[in-house]
């Protein structure tokens, strides 16, 4: 809703969000939830900047100039052409090099960019979500005031509460069960959240570990169910 309102009242062409916080606390999950609302039938456009700290990082992102030895196609143009999603997820943004920062400084201002082959990409009406593992108080050490001012919205996620962890267990378990019942109705019959997953969330500190435990418990239940049916 904020995204749609923002597009109507602000002149900035791109709605951009910077989400900071420790690893595994749900930054990517927030991006996927937003993507599922706007482009549920398309794969999310995701670029991990863990590999974008080298001197030629910008070439890897938008492509190498014509005639450049060892030319690269460019990950961003390639994924924009492959997916109609309106959500772009930039993961581990703090690891990008200066050239990449400058590229996004211009992109967030103008709403479009030109790749190395001269093709123009208009990203008006897109959402770009930048995630970073840096704590809120360190943001200014990595990003310039000019770049920070370009973001439409900035937030920092803290550690999960017990209530939030339990809500996440319910949400992910229901999501997995829905897929199971859709693809394997015979196996999924009579499976409910209450009788398939039992997690002491106090033992886990982030969503990633909780999700892994959910999948492990579901796999155990499904394996036992399949084995029991085969023995009947």
List the predicted regions and their residue ranges.
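Hydrophobic positions in the central parallel beta-sheet of the AAA+
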Residues: 47, 88-89, 128
């Amino acid at each position: 809703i904020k995204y749609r309102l923002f597009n109507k009242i602000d002149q900035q062409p791109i709605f951009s969000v910077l989400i900071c916080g420790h690893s595994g606390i749900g930054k990517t999950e927030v991006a996927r939830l937003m993507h599922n609302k706007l482009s549920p039938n398309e794969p999310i456009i995701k670029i991990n900047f863990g590999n974008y700290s080298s001197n030629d990082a910008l070439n890897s992102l938008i492509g190498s100039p014509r005639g450049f030895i060892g030319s690269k196609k460019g990950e961003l143009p390639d994924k924009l052409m492959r997916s109609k999603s309106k959500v772009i997820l930039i993961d581990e943004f703090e690891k990008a090099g200066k050239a990449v920062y400058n590229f996004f400084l211009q992109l967030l201002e103008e709403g479009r960019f030109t790749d190395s082959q001269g093709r123009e990409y208009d990203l008006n009406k897109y959402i770009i979500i930048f995630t970073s593992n840096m704590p809120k108080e360190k943001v200014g050490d990595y990003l310039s005031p000019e770049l920070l001012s370009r973001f439409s919205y900035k937030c920092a996620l803290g550690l999960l509460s017990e209530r939030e962890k339990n809500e996440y267990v319910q949400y992910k378990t229901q999501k997995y069960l829905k897929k199971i019942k859709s693809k394997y109705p015979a196996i999924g019959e009579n499976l409910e959240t209450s009788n398939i997953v039992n997690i002491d969330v106090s033992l886990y500190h982030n969503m990633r570990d909780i999700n892994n435990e959910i999948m492990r418990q579901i796999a155990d239940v499904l394996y036992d169910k399949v084995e029991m049916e085969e023995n009947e």
